[in-house]
Amino acid sequence: MSFDGFTDATEAQVTRAISDSWMEEFRERTDTEVIVVGGGPSGLVAAKELAERGVDVTIVEKNNYLGGGFWLGGFLMNKVTVRDPAQRVLDELGVPYEESDEAEGLYVADGPHACSALIKAACDAGAKIQNMTEFTDVVLREDDRVGGIVMNWTPVHALPRELTCVDPIAVESDLVLDATGHDAVVLSKLSERGVLDVNGIEHAKEHNTGMDKTADGEYGAPGHDSPGHDSMWVSESEDSIVDATGVVHPGVVASGMAVATAHHLPRMGPTFGAMLLSGRQAAQSCLDELGRDAPDVSISGPAPADD
């Protein structure tokens, strides 16, 4: 088998191809229907469901990678669990899984397979991604309705103040989905601005020094404990999070662990069914808020067809 070589392209042509394509897409995304802040499992599911129904949706993710904690289960083990009926999302994604001997309706899948399949599904549906981009503030309108977000490149945050002063930019949207996990950064900013009382954050202020932080006052990595939500209780947590997913402030919907912080609900640890189904519930909430004439999102999904 012979190889005839690649086609010719200069370095400048490669650079222009990248920058022109990125800028064209970015300009289109400065005013969109839904901005999903956080590209973890709940945010990806919500973006996928919305994009499949023709909603213009952009995911803003502060890391270089998507997926949040969905790549791994607990304790650096790369197996993830879901409980019935969330395995139907894995069926839809084509991700294999096995039922555990530990409990009926408890399923185990490979984290990298499940996470990469979900990322692909969101991209294939038409969701656009702005990664390495950090949420820094909200755009407010009349009556404190949120009308978009303020954002900056993630590396800017890591630079010492003496070395840089880089203003952020703002993008507008009809809705913002806080899918940022334990820290609930969109809700935290609204609380900081004094326009929203967030149960979990108020509890943290009363009983702790504040939201979970590491050195130098920075937020901890995804998966760290947070006084914004309650302690671990798998069965109570997952049901409660899906039930409480929805609008939390005019222009803002919350999903996933951000819901636990919003309502001071228990955490569920390394099981992901609530993240997946909360994403679906959040997508339906967004459709309702937008008034879109689109097929409803089935929260638990149709039962798999019989063989």
From Swiss-Prot:
InterPro entries: FAD/NAD-bd_sf, Thi4_fam, Thi4_prok. The modification 2,3-didehydroalanine (Cys) is found at C165. The keyword Iron applies. Its EC number is 2.4.2.60. This is Thiamine thiazole synthase. Glycine binds at R267. The gene is thi4. Keywords: Iron, Metal-binding, NAD, Thiamine biosynthesis, Transferase. It catalyses: [ADP-thiazole synthase]-L-cysteine + glycine + NAD(+) = [ADP-thiazole synthase]-dehydroalanine + ADP-5-ethyl-4-methylthiazole-2-carboxylate + nicotinamide + 3 H2O + 2 H(+). During the catalytic reaction, a sulfide is transferred from Cys-165 to a reaction intermediate, generating a dehydroalanine residue. It comes from the Archaea. SUPFAM superfamilies: FAD/NAD(P)-binding domain. Fe cation binds at D167, H182. Pathway: Cofactor biosynthesis; thiamine diphosphate biosynthesis. HAMAP family: Thi4. Gene3D superfamilies: FAD/NAD(P)-binding domain. PANTHER family: THIAMINE THIAZOLE SYNTHASE. It comes from Haloferax volcanii (strain ATCC 29605 / DSM 3757 / JCM 8879 / NBRC 14742 / NCIMB 2012 / VKM B-1768 / DS2).
